[in-house]
Design a protein with these regions (language model features):
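Residue-level signature of catalytic and energy-coupling elements of molecular machines
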Residues: 4, 18, 53-54, 69, ...
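Short hydrophobic/aromatic-rich motifs at helix boundaries and adjacent loops
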Residues: 10-15, 25-26, 56, 98-101, ...
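Hydrophobic membrane-targeting segments
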Residues: 1-38
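Pore-lining and gate-forming transmembrane alpha-helices of multi-pass membrane transport proteins
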Residues: 140-171
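Loop-to-transmembrane-helix entry motif
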Residues: 2-7, 94-112, 145, 149-156
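Alpha-helical transmembrane segments of integral membrane proteins
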Residues: 7-20, 106-113, 159-163
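Predominantly long cytosolic amphipathic alpha-helical stalk/bundle segments
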Residues: 31-118, 122-136, 166-215
């Protein structure tokens, strides 16, 4: 194998990085984190006062946004500042969950070039020890040995550059989600402060909001 045995951990890091990138792409889809119309639907539900615990639990399981809004509804009878504290606490847990595996991806981005450099150094040491034992010999063989040693450096960069790019990309996407989730939570707080009896069901509801019983 060109580059020698240090290529093995680099190949393993490549597989792990690819798996993390694909998993995070699937998990951090917008419709999975911030379902369209969910905030409006929950505000209409809260305004009507139809806050059955069963429906709150159902909301909690829909998405990270649903979990955040459900946390606010759990403590809706408390003062506004306590509701905000609950939202912030649950929000931290949700961010931690959305950032799952990103530290690993960042570590791969940092370790890839170092492993590549290590492989190159090992290859150069082996080559110069061979020269010490048998002399310079053919210059072409010397150039070939240097080229094989540098393969590790190139491989390390090939692993690290995409890992670093997607690490930053996912961090940015999560930061954007956090801003939107905070906005939806504040809007729900305002709705809880000024309940509106008989508010209509939000268009495009997904069955989370219970039907209004007739008088």
């Amino acid at each position: 194998m060109a580059g020698g045995w240090p290529m093995i951990p680099l190949l393993l890091l490549t597989v792990v990085a690819l798996a993390i990138i694909l998993e995070r792409f699937w998990t951090l889809r917008r419709k999975t984190v911030l379902p369209v119309g969910l905030g409006e639907e929950v505000r209409a539900w809260a305004a009507r006062g139809n806050l059955d615990p069963t429906h709150i639990d159902s909301l909690r399981r829909t998405s990270p946004l649903g979990a955040l809004l459900a946390a606010a509804l759990d403590v809706r009878h408390r003062p506004r500042d306590q509701i905000r504290e609950r939202i912030e606490d649950v929000g931290r847990h949700l961010v931690h969950r959305m950032e799952k595996f990103l530290n690993t991806l960042g570590s791969i981005a940092a370790a890839g070039p170092l492993l590549g450099l290590f492989g190159t150094v090992v290859g150069m040491i082996q080559m110069f020890l061979g020269i010490l034992d048998s002399g310079v010999g053919d210059v072409n063989e010397l150039a070939g040995g240097i080229g094989k040693a540098l393969v590790c450096t190139a491989a390390g960069m090939i692993v690290a550059i995409p890992a670093l790019f997607f690490h930053r990309y996912f961090r940015g996407r999560i930061a954007g989600y956090i801003v939107e989730m905070e906005h939806e939570a504040i809007q729900l707080l305002d709705t809880l402060d000024t309940p509106r009896a008989g508010a209509p069901v939000a268009a495009g509801g997904r069955g989370i909001v219970p039907p209004v019983s007739g008088s």
